[in-house]
């Protein structure tokens, strides 16, 4: 019988079909530790689940992981529900997770702690960014459910404390999957309106699941970005949500939020009354001081003898005018003198004057130079004549005029001794008026007496 060989693809698909048709492998509950966690840009999660002795690849697609509240991390122990299948490209089996929650810690509690740490690290809880709640808000916006005790408590408290204030209610869902987007949209709408001085965002008490919308990241970031100051009022006094940490001010209850947003009109009236009394008292004191000053002025010389005072002032004015005229004349004289001095200085230092002085100096120098040059030439001329006379006395030509001559060999060297030539050598004899070409036919040596 001939053997049939399977392809790798065929074998892998066969194994995959066997696994996927096994009902025990289509609804598997596992617990393990996350490692090699990767969050794909498309939202899918890829990681490994492991225990002390084994490991399995895990995939959680975006459609399923968007429902989990916490962020999976390496080292986290989790409980998962999914189905087993084979990834044909690698031939490996893996679990496709449909639900996941932390092992030992509540899903919502872990998500709360993770988001709290992350937002705090980003600075969203910092006091630096907290806006001041206005003390006398004219218009108060309320973002909460249109039904329930919270809205009634807020409106009742505001109207009781501050009946002249305006209240604008932005009805929203406060629990369920659509609650967070509803709250975010209401905050944006309020910020787009004009005239709202402060916002109250909150709801009545409830379980962590019921209050969860106020722990959503989108709500926290919307509160942080709000240009209008926000007072959070979520649940009871012991309930703390992420919104409470981000808000500009936290109120323990909705009623307390209304008291923080709206001033007490009775207290305001008391303040106005006290300030009115202080103002009236200050005005009475001011009027009394002015009356006393008026009485003093009425008793003064100016009030009793106004004509004399007028005449005195008129006389003072005349004198002041005279002094002004004299001062003006002195000032003009002073400036005229300064102008004359400047004119004299300018005339003295005028360029034409300077040129004339320079021209005279140059002419003087030229004459001096000519005299010195003439003297120098005369001195040089006298020295030249003396040198010429001395040179003439020492000149060989002068000696030649007395019958002497100079004898040269063929190389035109002056012969100083008979030893410098031989018989038959050609020599030249230079006389005063010419040169003789001669030949040596005889040599007669003489002894020099005393070297002469």
From Swiss-Prot:
GO terms for biological process: DNA catabolic process. It comes from the Bacteria. CDD domains: ExoVII_LU_OBF. It is found in: Cytoplasm. GO terms for molecular function: exodeoxyribonuclease VII activity; nucleic acid binding. It catalyses: Exonucleolytic cleavage in either 5'- to 3'- or 3'- to 5'-direction to yield nucleoside 5'-phosphates. One of its GO terms (cellular component) is cytoplasm. The keyword DNA-binding does not apply. Keywords: Cytoplasm, Exonuclease, Hydrolase, Nuclease. InterPro entries: Exonuc_VII_L, Exonuc_VII_lsu_C, OB-fold_nuc-bd_dom. Its EC number is 3.1.11.6. Heterooligomer composed of large and small subunits. Bidirectionally degrades single-stranded DNA into large acid-insoluble oligonucleotides, which are then degraded further into small acid-soluble oligonucleotides. HAMAP family: Exonuc_7_L. Belongs to the XseA family. This is Exodeoxyribonuclease 7 large subunit. It comes from Bacillus cereus (strain AH187). The lineage of its organism: Bacteria, Bacillati, Bacillota, Bacilli, Bacillales. The gene is xseA.
